[in-house]
Structures are given as structure tokens and as C-alpha cells.
Amino acid sequence: MSENKTRVDNAATGDIQHQGKDIFFAAVETTRMPMIVTDPNRPDNPIIFSNRAFLEMTGYTAEEILGTNCRFLQGPDTDPAVVQSIRDAIAQRNDISAEIINYRKDGSSFWNALFISPVYNDAGDLIYFFASQLDISRRKDAEEALRQAQKMEALGQLTGGIAHDFNNLLQVMGGYIDLIGSAAEKPVIDVQRVQRSVYHAKSAVERASTLTKQLLAFARKQKLQGRVLNLNGLVSIVEPLIERTFGPEVAIETDLEPALKNCRIDPTQAEVALLNIFINARDALIGRENPKVFIETRNLLVDELANMSYDGLLPGRYVSIAVTDNGIGMPASIRDRVMDPFFTTKEEGKGSGLGLSMVYGFAKQSGGAARIYTEEGVGTTLRLYFPVDEAGLTNTESPQASDRRLGSSERILIVEDRPDVAELAKMVLDDYGYVSEIVLNAREALKKFESGNMYDLLFTDLIMPGGMNGVMLAREVRRRYPKVKVLLTTGYAESSIERTDIGGSEFDVVSKPCMPHDLARKVRQVLDGPNGIA
């Protein structure tokens, strides 16, 4: 028997009346920490001794608990997994410490910091289990209050940043739209002035669209179009982007893993993430001697023991891409916040503070992680991890747009609960030669089909009230009318990379906001596709 085991004397039984036990139980009785002793040699491992502190903590009397198992302390919010871990430790005669929600006699709950240890006699026989306990409810409440305060601080920073950026964009859009309206009322229209106003208003819309995508990326709520690709190929694709970002004065070095595995990520969002990393590296290199950027890719195996070193990545195979600069680096106080939304050290107007938060969200939503290593005066490394995908490579080049730019009077049913959004979609599609109708919910759409109206395409919003969303409607239409093509639209998608047996989404999706020519092209692609999937 191990000499580390707790022993009480050389007796061979668990008789608590034995004279040799007096010192042990006297010590347990007089301590202020709640303690109990159980007897594993009796059926159901009952409590055979409890001190006054335990009785005061739980509200029970000794007569009520002696001879019973400790499970009377459990209740509705007690974690079954923790209970099972305690049972396993007792069965294996191991020490265990755990934090668990227990219940007093009056039904109130409390957080219990529990430590259980087996007690042996000199003959090596297990005679007791000793359990010390501590009510840590105040500590838990304080931790929760701190988390809530931190959450509210982050929320305040987030909403303040959103309001600031969107108010500026609304100012631009509203101002130029007013100018266009004023120009239309004049007897002689200044066409160039109107065109300039339209250009600036559209630019503001595009910036607002980028902002919402960055926010969704941080929240891991954006719709990702996952494709199997190789990060080495991605580096080659973004080489012109790297050169434009850093210019000739920054030395670029690469070390790419020759046998790098593939991964499934959204190539467009991956390029945006790398651009954000490059921009931060470029800014960190301003004024530095011999500025240098080093890009590397690696294969990585994360096992059970190492996963906590990789921000909790699940065990498995990963690929990584890292960008290292020899810039100014950053202190720990900034490093810990650099991926928070709207946190920026740049001057007003020089950055939104969403770049690295978007990188973080994109990596997490892709099933990976983002880690930053930095040292003041030395430089910074930002490394992204993505799960390996054994599927074949997908062509990441944009498909050639169909030569059929205009509709051929195909009939489209628009399902959108926002009348203004529906009307805009109808105007766009009608302008491109389609014949479109509007309904405001899924039930009305089904009635249109049931009444004999036939359509070539169902164009429906994803999230709608009334108990039937866009996906449910699309599935029902596909079931009843298999020849009808389907295109979904949304400004918000909870799913990440959708994986199905055919390697893609069940239905094609176009994200809001969408420029008219992009919508028309997507509609054309879906109509020309064999199964409604472009």
C-alpha cells in the first residue's frame, strides 16, 4: 500500500466507537469547516459522522442524515456530470475535488467546494471516505457579477462603436439622396452632379455592408461559403495583395509547408482576414528599420494533452498560417483586448477596430482558432488554425458569369415580410426582364402555388414570422413542385459552413445587402443550374 494514503490507526475495522478513533473524530468535530465521514463497507456508503459546521451549513440534524447516502444534497440544478465524476472517484478509491450545486433542508441552493479522500487503516483496508466542504456561493456570485460587468462594458463599447460608424454612413447616404431629390426637382438636371451623388451613396452602402459582415464575423453569425482549398495556394493568390499592402520597402519572406494538408474555409472571407492581418502588420512597421514580414504554413496535430495550449481546439489534425512582423509589438494590456470589437489604438478615422475581431470570428466559425503572440519592440505573430479536410480541392476561381445577363420573362415569386425590401427586389428583377410577384409570408406563397400559379423561381427571405421560415417553405415547395428553382436571401445566418452529402448547401443563398447586378446574376445562375443550386 502507498505510504501517501490517509490512515487513522492500526485498527482493522471502521468502528467509530473504537478508542483509537477519538483523536480523528475530535479533530473533525471541532473544525469550522463542514465535514462528514462515510462508511464504504456498509450498503450505499452511508454517512456515519458529521460535524456541527456541516449541520449548520445544510440545516439538517444529525438524526436526519446519519445512515443515509449524501445524495439528499442533490437537486434540480446539480450537474449530473459532476455527480458521475464523484461516483467514479469513489469507486476507484481516488481523491477528488469538485464544485457542485447542493441543496439545504429548506430547499435553497448553494455552491459547494467539495473534497473527498479515502481513509485507510494500517492493514491497508479502506475504512472511511472523508469529505470536507465549503459554501462558496459568495465567490461564485462575485465571479458572475464580474462577468456580467465585463459583458456590459464590452456591449457598451460595441454599441457605441456601431452607432458611431453607422451614423456617419447614414449621414453620407441621407445627404446624397437629398441632393439627388433636389436635383430631380430642377428644370435642368445636372447629370454629373447626380452621378457623383449616386456614386458616393453607393460607396456608403458598400461600407455599411462591410461593417455588418465584420460584425457578423466577430459574432460568428455570418454565412460562410466553405470550399476545400490549400493555404499555400491562398498565399499565392493574395501575393499581389501583399505587394500592394506593404510596398517595395518591406521585405516579404515565406516558408510554406511542402506537403500542407487541405482545409475547408470560405476563400473570400479568408482573403479578407489575411488583408486585415496584413494591414495591422503594415501599421506596426511604420518607422521601423529593415521592416520585414514572414509568412509560414504548417501541418499540426493537436492531442488531448495539448488542446488547451491551442485555445481549446478539439483534438485532431489542423493546418495553420502565420504572419509575423518585426514591428513595434504591443504590451499585454493591448494584446488581451486587440481582438475585441471596436478596440483600436489608431487615430480617429484610421480604423474601425473591427479588423482583428473579424479575423477571430472567422477562424472560430470555421472550426479553428486565432492566436496572437507579441513582444514590445520585437514584433507580432498572428496565427490562424483550421481543421484538415481530406476532400479534393475545389476551384476557388470565380465561375464565369452566364452570358444571359437579362431574364427571359421567367416568373419569380418573391416572399419577403418587409414590403419595402420586397418592392425593391421586384423593381430590380423586373428591370432585368423577369416577371415577378410579391407575397409577404410563407402561407401566402403556398396559396399562390396551390391556386395554380406556376413559377420558375422561388426567391424567399430566410427568417420570417408566422411559424414557417424560408427554409421550411423552400423544402415544401421543392417537395410539391420539384422543378421550381429556389434562392434564399438573408442578412443574418446562424449556420457556419454547411456540410452535406453533396458537399454544399441545401439551397443557394444570397446575402443582404446585395447590389442589383449581383442579385440579377445570382438569379440567372440559379435558374441555369440543374437543381436550383448555382
From Swiss-Prot:
FMN binds covalently to cysteine after exposure to blue light and this bond is spontaneously broken in the dark. The modification 4-aspartylphosphate is found at residue 461. The modification S-4a-FMN cysteine is found at residue 70. InterPro entries: CheY-like_superfamily, HATPase_C_sf, His_kinase_dom, HisK_dim/P_dom, HisK_dim/P_sf, PAC, PAS, PAS-assoc_C. Keywords: ATP-binding, Chromophore, Flavoprotein, FMN, Kinase, Nucleotide-binding, Phosphoprotein, Photoreceptor protein, Receptor, Sensory transduction, Transferase, Virulence. Residues 94-148 form the PAC domain. GO terms for molecular function: ATP binding; phosphorelay sensor kinase activity; photoreceptor activity. Residues 20-93 form the PAS domain. It is an enzyme of class 2 (transferase). Induction: Constitutively expressed when grown in minimal media. Photosensitive kinase and response regulator that is involved in increased bacterial virulence upon exposure to light. This is Blue-light-activated protein. It comes from Pseudomonas syringae pv. tomato (strain ATCC BAA-871 / DC3000).
